[in-house]
Amino acid sequence: MSQFSFTKMHGLGNSYIYVNMFEEQIPEEDLVLVAEKVSNINTGIGADGMILICPSDVAPVKMRMFNNDGSEGKSCGNGLRCVAKYAYEHKLVEETVFTIETLAGIVTAEVTVEEGKVTLAKIDMGAPRLTRAEIPMLGEGETPFIRENFLYNNHRYAFTAVSMGNPHAVIFVDDVEQAPLTTLGPVLETHEMFPERVNVEFIEILNDAEMNFRVWERGSGVTQACGTGACAAVVAAILNGKMERGKEITVHLAGGDLMIAWTEEGNVLMKGPAEVICRGVYEYKIEA
């Protein structure tokens, strides 16, 4: 029987099991199964996935993120805010502005601290990737993929594709509560045009500074929030002429609000909370 200490944290209800790999050890060959086991709501702790906080050669810390199906993602906005909180509060970093390595690249985090605790985290998510090769999608072309039609159940849905280190398909609807989240979501997620699968967001524009947001996450299904998805949604809204670049947008997710801005300089900034749920020790056994 093996075990490790964990901290369960969430960003707007998007929860992960966080493991401090500066102190713990999980064999590389076990990570996929451990992520599946620990995320299981019935036989594990229950979460949207597992995130490892690891040493890095190029930043103070490195984030590795696994979905609850065991697949490894390149980035996670809500996860980054929680990693930033954990790193500062556990003295893995000393400054309130620092970098985090991800499989999608290095991002900059800035934490707001009150009485030694991080209350907000702002992440510079970098520039969005908009070409088919960058997202990635099948096909050729260097122009952004904006409002392309997808036929489902005899209805045409126009989606815009954006990568924020992971792929997103953003669909604008009149009412997110009526959107085909659990039906169209998995169909589009696994469509052959997306070789690495895709996260699917449904967006309802409320005004020039607010939107409602629902998400079907690649590898996890319906979740309460998706930070990279909120960033992709704001980028897509600006590309479609629905919102203004350089302005801070409030994204209302099922789990709460994020503040997102696509700056004139090109990077996307995300600001929101990160909270600890519980801590403990998880025991597991990998069958031979």
Swiss-Prot record:
Site Could be important to modulate the pK values of the two catalytic cysteine residues: give positions. Answer: 168, 217
Per the record, a Pfam family?
A: DAP_epimerase
Pathway(s) it belongs to: Amino-acid biosynthesis; L-lysine biosynthesis via DAP pathway; DL-2,6-diaminopimelate from LL-2,6-diaminopimelate: step 1/1
Set out the biological process GO terms recorded for this chain's protein: lysine biosynthetic process via diaminopimelate
Query: What is the name listed in the Swiss-Prot or TrEMBL entry for this protein?
Result: Diaminopimelate epimerase
Q: What does this protein do?
A: Catalyzes the stereoinversion of LL-2,6-diaminopimelate (L,L-DAP) to meso-diaminopimelate (meso-DAP), a precursor of L-lysine and an essential component of the bacterial peptidoglycan.
Q: Where is this protein found?
A: Cytoplasm
Where does this protein come from, organism-wise?
Bacillus cereus (strain G9842)
Question: What catalytic activity is recorded?
Answer: (2S,6S)-2,6-diaminopimelate = meso-2,6-diaminopimelate
**The protein's assembly and partners:** Homodimer.
List keywords of the entry alphabetically. Amino-acid biosynthesis, Cytoplasm, Isomerase, Lysine biosynthesis
Annotated residues for binding of substrate: 14, 67, 77-78, 166, 199, 217-218, 227-228
GO cellular component, alphabetical, reads: cytosol
> What family does this chain come from, according to its entry?
Belongs to the diaminopimelate epimerase family.
